[in-house]
């Protein structure tokens, strides 16, 4: 488990309660939030819609849309993604941009049966697709002049709360050998060996920071990569050109990795130049889900549809690592006896933590309608329900009591942090001969119970155009999404002494779908 303090012996992980459980509640949400994805055509319409068919995005959206196919096709959608992140931390503004090209943002093949003119079931189609359901790529940097606290203050509060003695902190440290190097088993043990915290007496608590007075310039960096990709198998049929039904099964593969550093640069400190807190996480996982969908054509000008998607049942394996690095004024620091000493270490890694757990993502349901403007195009809209409050996480990696506490703790945190939402998408397509023009907009509601004066809803804007021939089609699309989030480097007993970074993201996707009929 990811805990910032896990002292061996008689000290249990202080943060294996609230903070650790909230971390895994956040993980469940991260792997459950679906971005705009699919073909350029559907992304240009504002996202995947419940009441429109004849597009390969129906394979993982509403599989009933496969019933509209009257010929087979194969298509691929390369995507270029650019993410601009702006941070605001203690009044300092920073901007970071990052771009990435993916050859196969979406790839699909649809195989359609011959029409049955004499039967009620006119035709059916089988589809297979590969799609990037989520991209975890993000990079940001924040800076700020902090006169109130440092990460060091959090370590002091944690170790004093634990009541750990110096001998217990020593037991949580392995000096290693000349080839292996030092290794700590808790954050306080690392800070103790670096003389960043000192005991008040032989028995330890209360510990004090080696410098608790100097202001500092804080610099934080975050770099994340990875994606949630899905292979989907789907089947859809057409009953009498009125009722379209379909079902699909999706297999997910999740890869997520981040590296985070918080550097405290001390200003005019008699002891410290800077202290770095390093953190890294690598996650891999697999999951499975299923979707059932229906579309009903009321008349040539109007049709409505809906789909139900089960939670994705997934399992994850993670490795969490941390390290502490310090740089001292003139290479020396004041020790517990009040004299200047030269520390034996300036960099201490912590033992990596492996953990395995399972997540049940939200149930999803979509309902929509489409109005056709004769042969000139259509307008379509979709309302989507997402049950974020129903997410679950559990594990069998710990002992029975630990497994139970993990399950109950994450359920409690999910209910306290997240709420069910209703998302809305609207799009339209205009046709002139073989040419198509498209536009769309989507609103993804804020899933957090506590808004914290930050609106975390997302707005999605999209435009696109395409051409359709007898044997070939091509669609070009572009999307813009905006969102806000909050990152708090550390918390203290007094909320007035620490700050949070507000992160504003703008994500631009440009995609090209090319395909052929056969």
Task: Enumerate the language-model features and the residues they cover.
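Outer-membrane beta-barrel porins/channels
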Residues: 23-37, 42, 112-518
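Outer-membrane beta-barrel translocator/receptor signature
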Residues: 40, 52-61, 67-147, 229
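Bacterial N-terminal signal peptides that target proteins for export
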Residues: 1-8
């Amino acid at each position: 488990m990811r805990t910032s303090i896990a002292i061996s012996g008689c000290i249990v992980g202080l943060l294996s309660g609230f903070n650790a459980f909230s971390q895994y509640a956040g993980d469940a949400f991260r792997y459950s939030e679906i971005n705009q994805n699919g073909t350029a055509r559907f992304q240009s319409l504002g996202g995947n819609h419940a009441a429109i068919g004849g597009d390969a995005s129906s394979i993982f959206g509403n599989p009933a849309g496969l019933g509209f196919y009257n010929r087979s096709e194969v298509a691929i959608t390369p995507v270029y993604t650019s993410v601009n992140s702006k941070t605001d931390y203690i009044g300092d503004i920073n901007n970071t941009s990052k771009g990435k090209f993916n050859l196969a943002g979406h790839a699909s093949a649809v195989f359609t049966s011959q029409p049955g003119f004499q039967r009620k079931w006119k035709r059916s189609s089988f589809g297979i697709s590969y799609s990037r359901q989520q991209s975890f790529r993000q990079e940001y940097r924040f800076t700020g002049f902090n006169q109130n606290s440092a990460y060091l203050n959090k370590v002091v509060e944690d170790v004093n709360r634990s009541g750990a003695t110096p001998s217990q902190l020593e037991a949580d440290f392995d000096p290693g050998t000349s080839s292996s190097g030092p290794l700590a088993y808790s954050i306080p043990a690392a800070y103790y060996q670096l003389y960043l915290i000192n005991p008040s007496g032989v028995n330890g608590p209360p510990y004090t920071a080696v410098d608790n007075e100097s202001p500092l310039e804080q610099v934080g960096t975050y770099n994340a990569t990875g994606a949630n990709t899905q292979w989907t198998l789907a089947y859809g049929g057409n009953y009498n050109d009125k009722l379209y039904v379909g079902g699909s099964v999706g297999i997910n593969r999740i890869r997520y990795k981040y590296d985070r550093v918080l550097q405290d640069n001390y200003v005019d400190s008699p002891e410290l130049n800077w202290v770095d807190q390093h953190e890294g996480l690598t996650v891999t996982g697999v999951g499975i889900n299923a979707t059932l969908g229906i579309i009903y054509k009321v008349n040539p000008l109007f049709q409505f549809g809906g789909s139900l998607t089960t939670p994705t049942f997934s399992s994850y394996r993670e490795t969490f690592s941390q390290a502490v690095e310090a740089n001292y004024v003139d290479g020396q620091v004041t020790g517990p006896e009040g004299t200047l000493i030269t520390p034996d270490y300036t960099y201490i890694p912590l033992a990596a933590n492996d953990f395995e757990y399972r997540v049940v993502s939200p149930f999803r349901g979509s309902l929509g309608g489409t109005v056709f403007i004769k042969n000139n195009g259509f307008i379509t809209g979709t309302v989507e329900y997402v049950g974020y409050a129903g997410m679950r996480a559990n594990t069998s990696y710990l002992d029975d009591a630990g497994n139970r506490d993990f399950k109950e703790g994450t359920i409690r945190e999910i209910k306290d942090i997240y709420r069910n939402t209703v998302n809305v998408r609207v799009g339209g397509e205009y046709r002139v001969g073989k040419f198509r023009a498209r536009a769309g907009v989507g609103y993804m509601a804020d899933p957090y119970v506590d808004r914290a004066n930050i609106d975390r809803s997302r707005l999605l804007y999209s435009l696109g155009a395409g051409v359709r021939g007898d044997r070939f089609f091509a669609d070009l699309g572009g999307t813009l999404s905006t969102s806000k989030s909050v990152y708090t480097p550390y918390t203290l007993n007094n909320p007035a002494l620490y700050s949070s970074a507000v992160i504003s993201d703008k994500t631009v996707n440009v995609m090209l779908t090319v395909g052929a009929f056969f």
